[in-house]
């Protein structure tokens, strides 16, 4: 998981922004010549690292290592048996590495190239344009698990929360929670059909489909929420679109050209979906239920001010947590009224 974290933050330009202003163009790519004399995994990693570096591809060595390892049937280059490092590859393997590397030269994210990625120890299928789960979102999951553990200890019984995830994408958050909370149930919603399909696929892949209800739903449509199969909820969890609209053009090529912009663009102040979630929460949550959100570092103050202007919601911002880069990234909001 380290690759995407380093790649993402290396591409950031300015505090709290996911992206880069580096220019690029598909038309500049040309097919690579035959790899004469290159036959081993180590040689191929070295070759493609050099090619990527010359073309300004972020995380050049890590990208080449992941691609070569994938073709050889491993998740990481370091996990390959040392004997495979110097063993000659077949012509089919060489061709596959060339084809995958050409996609990286077009700035396709490694996660889409490989077609899978690990999140919280789960191997998830990745398909463009469904949003790729970031490493900091694993910290959001860990915070939710801590809260469930604390509540379970307080009541003296195992945690069996009913959880709603808004904007499930690949299902990373929902499936991680289900895998670590065996008594839990999850409702996962998303307005994008591609995300719903991928969450279904990942749930079946992990054999968690019996405890998750996946719904194609636009959360901005209030009438849709009257048809939820379970409720009320103990927890609402979301990594919503939170990029400020004016920052969308500054996103890195890997993000801007491959991921669904609707999963990123949060409107003028990045708050459009966040405020929809908060406005609906009192109708969906149990008494003392909680909301956990991943947000832009500029959002904690904006959310706090917005909640103060809506006392009728009976929602309080009780905690803000920083991500691994020290930025205020996660919010815990609790219902505290009727």
UniProtKB/Swiss-Prot annotation:
Protein name as it appears in the record: MTRF1L release factor glutamine methyltransferase
Top EC group: transferase
SUPFAM superfamilies per record: S-adenosyl-L-methionine-dependent methyltransferases (SSF53335)
Superkingdom of source: Eukaryota
Primary subcellular site in the record, as a coarse category: mitochondrion
Gene Ontology cellular component list: mitochondrion
The encoding gene: HEMK1
GO biological-process terms attached to the record: methylation; translational termination
Keyword Nucleotide-binding found: no
Family per record: Belongs to the protein N5-glutamine methyltransferase family.
InterPro entries: DNA_methylase_N6_adenine_CS, HemK-like, N4/N6-MTase_EcoPI_Mod-like, N5-glutamine_MTase, PrmC_N, RF_methyltr_PrmC, SAM-dependent_MTases_sf, Small_mtfrase_dom
Matching PROSITE patterns: N6_MTASE
Purpose of the protein: N5-glutamine methyltransferase responsible for the methylation of the glutamine residue in the universally conserved GGQ motif of the mitochondrial translation release factors MTRF1, MTRF1L, MRPL58/ICT1 and MTRFR.
GO molecular function, one term: DNA binding
PANTHER family, per the entry: HEMK METHYLTRANSFERASE, MTRF1L RELEASE FACTOR GLUTAMINE METHYLTRANSFERASE
UniProt keywords, alphabetically: Methyltransferase, Mitochondrion, S-adenosyl-L-methionine, Transferase
Residues binding substrate, per UniProt: 239-242
EC numbers, comma separated: 2.1.1.297
Location in or out of the cell: Mitochondrion
């Amino acid at each position: 998981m380290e690759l995407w974290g380093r790649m993402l933050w290396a591409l950031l330009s300015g505090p709290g922004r996911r992206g880069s202003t580096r220019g690029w163009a598909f038309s500049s790519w040309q097919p690579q010549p035959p790899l004469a004399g290159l036959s081993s995994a180590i040689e191929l990693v070295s070759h493609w690292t050099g090619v990527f570096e010359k073309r300004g591809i972020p995380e050049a060595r890590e990208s080449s290592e992941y691609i070569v390892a994938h073709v050889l049937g491993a998740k990481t280059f370091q996990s390959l048996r040392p004997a495979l490092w110097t063993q000659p590859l077949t012509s089919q393997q060489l061709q596959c590495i060339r084809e995958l590397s050409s996609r990286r030269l077009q700035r396709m994210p490694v996660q889409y190239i490989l077609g899978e990625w690990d999140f919280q120890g789960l191997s998830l299928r990745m398909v463009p344009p469904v949003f790729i789960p970031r490493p900091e979102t694993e910290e959001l999951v860990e915070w939710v698990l801590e809260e469930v553990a604390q509540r379970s200890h307080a009541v003296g019984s195992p945690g069996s929360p009913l959880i709603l995830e808004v904007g499930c994408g690949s299902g990373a958050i929902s499936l991680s929670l289900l895998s670590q909370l065996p008594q839990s149930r999850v409702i996962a919603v998303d307005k994008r059909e591609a995300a719903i399909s991928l969450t279904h696929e990942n749930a079946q892949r992990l054999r968690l489909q019996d405890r998750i209800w996946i719904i194609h739903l636009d959360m901005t449509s209030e009438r849709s929420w009257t048809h939820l199969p379970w409720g009320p909820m103990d927890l609402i969890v979301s990594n919503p679109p939170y990029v400020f609209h004016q920052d969308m053009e500054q996103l890195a090529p890997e993000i801007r050209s491959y991921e669904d912009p609707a999963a990123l663009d949060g409107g003028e102040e990045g708050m459009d979906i966040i405020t929809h979630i908060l406005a609906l929460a009192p109708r969906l949550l149990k008494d003392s239920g909680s909301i956990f959100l991943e947000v832009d570092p500029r959002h904690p103050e904006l959310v706090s001010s917005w909640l103060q202007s809506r006392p009728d919601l009976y929602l309080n911002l009780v905690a803000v947590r920083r991500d691994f880069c020290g930025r205020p990234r996660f919010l815990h909001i609790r219902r505290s009224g009727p």
